[in-house]
């Protein structure tokens, strides 16, 4: 099976890239694509760059040029739910934009005109990730909503405002909704799997710098388990 894995930063893709066999890397429009073999699958690893525009552009190139059957977006995120800690892993059930507001025209907050309010992750991929999470003993793995915006959520006031908009939000980051929207348009199944590098609003910038590598390791190890179970 041809599976695409997307991470925004070098720290988020380095470990998985090192695990690929027969790896070949090429750069298209500034985006790094590495093809290789892992767990019996052909894997295309994309380093997309940070933010929604980079994520949307690179995911479009990915789907047009490499035509993966499924897409997994991995990396770090900021935790939003009160039950979460740094290092925990969140599996998306749904992804939304948290910085889109066209409510003046009767759209839901976060809804892009012409798009659904949220983008549902593939149920089979979520179920598979759930199966893998049962084997995790040292970290908490949960599933829920992830929201995306082009900002790092270190301001407690902004965090509170987003919480008011999305009651059941588990994590925030800067690429997933763009990846999900492109996959939705191309009708390619996707899931977002993110490990928490910080808890949004609580000295997030300090925590992010300290725990990014830990988050990358947790998310990569979990991705490998999913690939091993994927048939």
Curated annotation (Swiss-Prot):
Function of this protein?
Answer: Catalyzes the irreversible cleavage of the glycosidic bond in both 5'-methylthioadenosine (MTA) and S-adenosylhomocysteine (SAH/AdoHcy) to adenine and the corresponding thioribose, 5'-methylthioribose and S-ribosylhomocysteine, respectively. Also cleaves 5'-deoxyadenosine, a toxic by-product of radical S-adenosylmethionine (SAM) enzymes, into 5-deoxyribose and adenine.
Q: What class of enzyme is it?
A: hydrolase
- Report residues binding substrate: 78, 153, 174-175
Which SUPFAM superfamilies does the annotation name? Purine and uridine phosphorylases
Task: Describe the family membership recorded for this protein in Swiss-Prot or TrEMBL.
Answer: Belongs to the PNP/UDP phosphorylase family. MtnN subfamily.
Name the gene for this chain.
Answer: mtnN
**Entry annotation: catalytic residues:** 12 (proton acceptor), 198 (proton donor)
The protein's name? 5'-methylthioadenosine/S-adenosylhomocysteine nucleosidase
Annotated InterPro entries: MTA_SAH_Nsdase, Nucleoside_phosphorylase_d, Nucleoside_phosphorylase_sf
Catalytic reaction annotation: S-adenosyl-L-homocysteine + H2O = S-(5-deoxy-D-ribos-5-yl)-L-homocysteine + adenine; S-methyl-5'-thioadenosine + H2O = 5-(methylsulfanyl)-D-ribose + adenine; 5'-deoxyadenosine + H2O = 5-deoxy-D-ribose + adenine
Give the record's GO CC terms.
Answer: cytosol
Give the record's GO biological process terms. Answer: L-methionine salvage from methylthioadenosine; L-methionine salvage from S-adenosylmethionine; nucleoside catabolic process
Keyword field: Amino-acid biosynthesis, Hydrolase, Methionine biosynthesis
- Which Enzyme Commission number(s) are on file for it? 3.2.2.9
Q: Which pathway does it take part in? A: Amino-acid biosynthesis; L-methionine biosynthesis via salvage pathway; S-methyl-5-thio-alpha-D-ribose 1-phosphate from S-methyl-5'-thioadenosine (hydrolase route): step 1/2
Organism of provenance: Bacillus thuringiensis subsp. konkukian (strain 97-27)
